[in-house]
Amino acid sequence: MKTVAVVGSQWGDEGKGKVIDFLATQADVVVRGQGGNNAGHTLVVDGKKFALRLIPSGILNSNTINVIGNGIVFDPKGFFEEIEMLESNGISTKNIKISDRAHIVFPYHKELDGLAEEARGDNKIGTTKKGIGPCYMDKTERSGIRVCDLMDKEIFAKKLKLQVDAKNKLVTGVYGKEAMFDFDEIYNEFIVYAEKMRPYVEDTTVIVYDAIKANKKVLFEGAQGTLLDLDLGTYPFVTSSHPTSGGFAVGAGVGPNMIKDVVGIVKAYTTRVGEGPFVTELFDETGDRIRTQGHEFGTVTGRARRCGWFDAVIVKYAARVNGLTSISFMLLDVLTGFDKIKICTAYKMGDKIVNNFPASLEDLAKCEPVYEELDGWHEDITKVEKFEDLPENAKKYIARIEELIGVNVDLVSVGPNKIGRASCRERV
């Protein structure tokens, strides 16, 4: 491992935390460069779970520097809740670095997130109402407030006043509500955060660049998934950032050639949270069984995830747009006990066979899965430690997916625990 990016290759919730946790133990630097505290990742240490949203996964390793990069939208309140949770469990937080270029999520972003979703009526996009989208809107509009602004009281006061006035006009003029944002209240709250944040704030682009040039091991930690990418995902049912390998480079402030390997995290089946077309979605007992066996409920929201068979069209697309160099195949054990397992190898839209993932959601909604059926397995695989010890039908399933995607599966997750949960092929 030198520089590795870990990217979700479906709609998120693929089990990235397991692989990131595994790789973070070897990393000198772990970087998060996109999203905010809308996407959760769970780490397990000695049977204890730590649900993190902003802080990188290397935090459990005392010698690892954990970078919250310039591409993050930073929620100070959520950040310090995580700090308190970690420190109360005896975990040091001194090795966290926050980019001075990261944009800040304010209370008005969260309120506007909820108002906008409510106004959509039947056309909701499934926002987590964490203020992520509105914060990125301010960033794109070039009116946002960054961490470096918060570090200067006068600059912060000037910019916050403009924003509070603008947001109150938006609330009254567009949503027909009374003005709800108070400058003094927000200013006083965030000035306290500023002083608490100050020891963590640096130009993180220098930290990441210097680490790579010194041949240190750097892990780019992805959140969410490829199909939630603002440009490349199932728009508009996407997030407001770029959870793809190209987005990681921008969000960390380094050139794309500095990321040598891109590991795609792929669930052995397909899940999705929220709205939008889902070609292989199962509405029967099989879908319920996958959901139950896979414990498919959101880390942050608790929402039940929609479940379906493996969609090779999606993952082949993700492999292409991310430049995947390998795949980590997660939650294979969830499929244990099925007599037959299906793989979606293409879509059918009317009389037409579709092999590439459509841009148009209207087209995607018309697509039906073209399935290939394989024999399942009934052996317990949760204690398997070597790839060759997997049941033959499980190995055939993986081999067929490698063939369809064109990328090697180098890591297979076979259970919930850190020890004995993964079987690595010899080439890893």
Predicted regions mapped to residue ranges:
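Non-transmembrane, aqueous-exposed alpha-helical and coiled segments at domain scale
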Residues: 1-423
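Positively charged, low-complexity/disordered segments
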Residues: 425-428
